[in-house]
Amino acid sequence: MARRRRAEVRQLQPDLVYGDVLVTAFINKIMRDGKKNLAARIFYDACKIIQEKTGQEPLKVFKQAVENVKPRMEVRSRRVGGANYQVPMEVSPRRQQSLALRWLVQAANQRPERRAAVRIAHELMDAAEGKGGAVKKKEDVERMAEANRAYAHYRW
């Protein structure tokens, strides 16, 4: 059992271009070694690429991509009588968002394109259309939860 208080959730500042907290969270996920300006530049360059390629509002494409990657269900390990069961559970809204942003960045980093902004732009466009690596990851997680529905009664 935890002996300390639960860490309070820090409120993020909205980003300067779109005034959106979700964009700030995504920039933070892109960031490596504390280089936030570089991460922000990568994201805004990706937005320009999205604008050029699709002609749509980049923020709309980004939000649609995040929505398409959010998992509804996931499995968690639960030990019962010496056996580990993969128990399907609903995902809280905060964790849905966190997982979606993480999976988008991971899927973008596995793409073959050389520039980070291009990788992120293409992954966001694919995810907004319901395809791409991040959407596949979401579907895999939800498929696992569906396959383990028999253990749903072990929920806590």
Swiss-Prot record:
Domain of life: Bacteria
Pfam name, any one: Ribosomal_S7
GO biological process, one term: translation
Matches recorded under InterPro entries: Ribosomal_uS7, Ribosomal_uS7_bac/org-type, Ribosomal_uS7_CS, Ribosomal_uS7_dom, Ribosomal_uS7_dom_sf
A GO CC term attached to the entry: small ribosomal subunit
Gene for this chain: rpsG
Species the sequence originates in: Thermus thermophilus (strain ATCC 27634 / DSM 579 / HB8)
Record note on quaternary structure: Part of the 30S ribosomal subunit. Contacts proteins S9 and S11. Binds to the C-terminus of IF3 and to the C-terminus of Era.
Family: Belongs to the universal ribosomal protein uS7 family.
Reported function: One of the primary rRNA binding proteins, it binds directly to 3'-end of the 16S rRNA where it nucleates assembly of the head domain of the 30S subunit. Is located at the subunit interface close to the decoding center. Binds mRNA and the E site tRNA blocking its exit path in the ribosome. This blockage implies that this section of the ribosome must be able to move to release the deacetylated tRNA.
PROSITE patterns linked: RIBOSOMAL_S7
Alphabetical UniProt keywords: Ribonucleoprotein, Ribosomal protein, RNA-binding, rRNA-binding, tRNA-binding
SUPFAM superfamilies per the UniProt record, alphabetical: Ribosomal protein S7
Protein name: Small ribosomal subunit protein uS7
One Gene Ontology MF term: structural constituent of ribosome
